[in-house]
């Protein structure tokens, strides 16, 4: 993976700071979990591995949902919204990001929050809807349970929902019955790229 990243960077002739996203928990550039990638990444400093491949170029590695949340809060659906903004990405699992007045609370992993005896993503990921053949109405009830569990813990000011299914937000967001406003992501597939660039140039957690 590091060699592929280096090849892309070199192709564009980029020598400035680089932001890289990863589908799991990352602390100080070190990979802590590996749900959808090889377990050998756990405990490895992805930041150092990639930087070494790039001859010492500055590299920042962060969770992919965190990157998307940063971008949506600053430039997308959460633009000009103060307080606590929570991004949830619905796909194979559920990714999450929490932004408070522009600052990231990293690695929240709400997809693994227990809701009614099940992990949130086992209850309400869009893959569950597809696998079980649920209607949007039935699936929205499960999403509502996840949102309410998060609301009970932290009282957010806005939920932003992303992932491929957010493109059909008009079919299910109006069916949600939680108290906090819910809006679809605006930047879609570019959110992670924009957020990675933000993290590469600024300390987004302080």
Whereabouts are the PLM-identified features?
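Short loop/edge segments at beta-strand edges and connector loops
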Residues: 61-65
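Gly/Ser/Thr-enriched, mixed-charge loops and adjacent short helices
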Residues: 67-69
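Internal amphipathic helical hairpin motif
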Residues: 45-49
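A charged helix-plus-loop insertion that forms the helical arch/lid used to bind
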Residues: 31-44
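ATP-binding/phosphotransfer module of carbohydrate and carboxylate kinases, centering on a glycine-rich
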Residues: 1-18, 26-30, 50-59, 71-90, ...
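Conserved NAD(P)H cofactor-binding loop of Rossmann-fold oxidoreductase domains
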Residues: 23
């Amino acid at each position: 993976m590091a060699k592929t990243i280096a090849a892309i960077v070199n192709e564009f002739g980029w020598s400035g700071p680089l932001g890289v996203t990863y589908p799991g928990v990352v602390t100080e550039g070190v990979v802590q979990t590996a749900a959808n990638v090889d377990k050998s990444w756990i405990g490895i400093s992805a930041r150092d591995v990639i930087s070494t491949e790039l001859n010492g170029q500055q590299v920042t590695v962060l969770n992919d949902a965190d990157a998307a949340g940063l971008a949506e809060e600053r430039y997308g659906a959460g633009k000009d919204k103060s307080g606590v903004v929570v991004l949830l990405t619905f796909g194979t699992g559920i990714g999450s990001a929490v932004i408070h007045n522009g600052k990231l609370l990293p690695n929240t992993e709400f997809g693994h929050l227990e809701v009614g005896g099940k992990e949130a993503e086992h209850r309400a990921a869009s893959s569950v809807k597809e696998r079980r053949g649920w209607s949007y109405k039935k699936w929205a009830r499960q999403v509502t349970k996840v949102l309410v569990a998060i609301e009970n813990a932290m009282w957010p000011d806005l939920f932003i929902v992303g992932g491929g299914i957010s493109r059909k937000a008009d079919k299910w967001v109006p069916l949600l019955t939680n108290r906090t406003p819910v809006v679809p992501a605006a930047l879609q597939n570019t959110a992670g790229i924009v957020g990675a660039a933000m993290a590469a140039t600024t300390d987004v957690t302080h």
